[in-house]
Amino acid sequence: MKIQKVLVIKSSMTENLPSGSFSSALSDKFMEYYRKENPIDKIIELNLNDQKDLISLSSQNFNTFFTDGVSDKYIDQLKSVDKVVISSPMTNFNYTALLKNYLDRILVANKTFSYKYSKKGEAIGLLPHLKVQILTTQGAPLGWYTWGDHTKNLEGTFEFIGAKVAKSVVMDGLKTPQYSSLKAPEALDLFDKVIKTAAENF
């Protein structure tokens, strides 16, 4: 059996709060089940909170943003792994700013996608070897904000660069009366079957 390299990306900014992070807890639970099924796989953890070079794209750095070597570092990492597990809470109807900065670094023409040789003008993803699992959390019920679906956004983004995206795991409704009093471990119990099934199939 081939050893798979798995990159686990966390993007929550609330890990250090007393309440903790639901999305990071979801990632940890998913990986707990994944490790049981795949004990020899190599796990690489990337917490975006610790990456000081993931600064926002602005007029101050636009001219050098894609040529300063930072994008290549993260793109090369993606090229070196077989699977990616990425987690994010919903923040203001989107994924986190940390994750936005990361995506700005890896979405680079002719490195992760290309329009060259495209017959109909559509993009060709350059990372078809990747298998991606998206794990998200949100306070609102699924589909509540029709204009802000961070899960679908992430699915489309990774499909755009050629990755095979597994069915996402979404812990939704966490701010509704049914779940709002629960801490992360209790909420995870309610979604446990979905998480376990996804991990076993990834």
From Swiss-Prot:
<keyword id="KW-0288">FMN</keyword>
<dbReference type="GO" id="GO:0016652">
    <property type="term" value="F:oxidoreductase activity, acting on NAD(P)H as acceptor"/>
</dbReference>
<comment type="similarity">
    <text>Belongs to the azoreductase type 1 family.</text>
</comment>
<dbReference type="GO" id="GO:0010181">
    <property type="term" value="F:FMN binding"/>
</dbReference>
<comment type="function">
    <text>Also exhibits azoreductase activity. Catalyzes the reductive cleavage of the azo bond in aromatic azo compounds to the corresponding amines.</text>
</comment>
<feature type="binding site">
    <location>
        <begin position="21"/>
        <end position="23"/>
    </location>
    <ligand>
        <name>FMN</name>
    </ligand>
</feature>
<dbReference type="InterPro" id="IPR023048">
    <property type="entry name" value="NADH:quinone_OxRdtase_FMN_depd"/>
</dbReference>
<dbReference type="Pfam" id="PF02525">
    <property type="entry name" value="Flavodoxin_2"/>
</dbReference>
<keyword id="KW-0285">Flavoprotein</keyword>
<dbReference type="InterPro" id="IPR050104">
    <property type="entry name" value="FMN-dep_NADH:Q_OxRdtase_AzoR1"/>
</dbReference>
<keyword id="KW-0560">Oxidoreductase</keyword>
<dbReference type="GO" id="GO:0009055">
    <property type="term" value="F:electron transfer activity"/>
</dbReference>
<keyword id="KW-0520">NAD</keyword>
<dbReference type="GO" id="GO:0016655">
    <property type="term" value="F:oxidoreductase activity, acting on NAD(P)H, quinone or similar compound as acceptor"/>
</dbReference>
<feature type="binding site">
    <location>
        <position position="12"/>
    </location>
    <ligand>
        <name>FMN</name>
    </ligand>
</feature>
<dbReference type="InterPro" id="IPR003680">
    <property type="entry name" value="Flavodoxin_fold"/>
</dbReference>
<comment type="function">
    <text>Quinone reductase that provides resistance to thiol-specific stress caused by electrophilic quinones.</text>
</comment>
<comment type="subunit">
    <text>Homodimer.</text>
</comment>
<dbReference type="InterPro" id="IPR029039">
    <property type="entry name" value="Flavoprotein-like_sf"/>
</dbReference>
<protein>
    <recommendedName>
        <fullName>FMN-dependent NADH:quinone oxidoreductase</fullName>
        <ecNumber>1.6.5.-</ecNumber>
        <ecNumber>1.7.1.17</ecNumber>
    </recommendedName>
</protein>
